[in-house]
Amino acid sequence: MVRLPQAQGHLIVMTQSAIGLNQRQVIHRQVWARKKALRALYHDFHRQLFENCPAGSVLDIGGGTAHIKESRPDVVSADILSFPGIDVVADAHRLPFRNEIFDGVVMLDVLHHLERPIEFLKEASRVLKPGGCLAMIEPAMTTIARRFYDRFHEEPVDMNADPFALVAIDPDRDPFDANQAIPTLLFATAPACRRIEQTVPSLRVRTVEWHSLFAYPMSGGFQKWSLIPGSLVGPMLALERKVPAPVRKHLAFRMMIVLQRI
């Protein structure tokens, strides 16, 4: 077993080789252990995801390095790649669970990596109990954020893509391939949300909110640098919550999307 860095104080050196693990995930776990600001931000993301789900069983899709379990250990974490803390290795398009088993499904930066997002939404609906919720936090292509993502982020942004298209599944596809525009194309407007509900009639779009204005971009995410100390994340998030919604829609780097199973 590989002992990975823990988010307590300084980085703990791995006691064994991480051979067999995806090296990008190993690096992410190392950055997670070092950056207090990153952990503070993601714990707040986790809180928001859980608050938008009913009480009960929760499935975390695209769990990555399983950091969500620091917020809630009983969550079932699934990912297409194996990693310590991941309970189920599975493709999000074909979940290995029976119908109507979970009260909530949560995802953080996952939808924009999926080849067939509509197929996934149908699969999420299948495993949700009636009244259950799918809560997602994803990149938002707002006035400010899109310029940042276009220039500085390694993942591409293609606003001309058709997220409803039936593309062939590529078995050799890199699971980190992405189009950061997908969540915005699917949920940023009322007509887009109506099309989702028509295409997946068992789901209703409950909320689409815009957040992550200042603290998240200043943290550097999973990059090694940060422009904000961990102690300032809480006060800055409190300030962000006071920004009026019409302004947030132009400044936000992320969007919270909640769909409910009917």
Functional labels for PLM-detected ranges:
Residues 180-202, 207:
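Short alpha-helix
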Residues 71-73, 88-89, 145-150, 217-223:
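Short aromatic-enriched loop/helix-cap "lid" or pocket-rim segments at secondary-structure transitions
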Residues 88-105:
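A short acidic, Gly/Pro-enriched loop at the edge of an enzyme's catalytic core
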Residues 118-133:
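A short glycine-rich, Lys/Arg-flanked "PGG" loop and its adjoining helix->strand segment in the class I
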Residues 43, 198-262:
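A C-terminal cap/extension of S-adenosyl-L-methionine-dependent methyltransferases
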Residues 134-171:
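Conserved class I S-adenosyl-L-methionine
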Residues 104-110, 136:
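A short beta-strand submotif of the Rossmann-like class I SAM-dependent methyltransferase core
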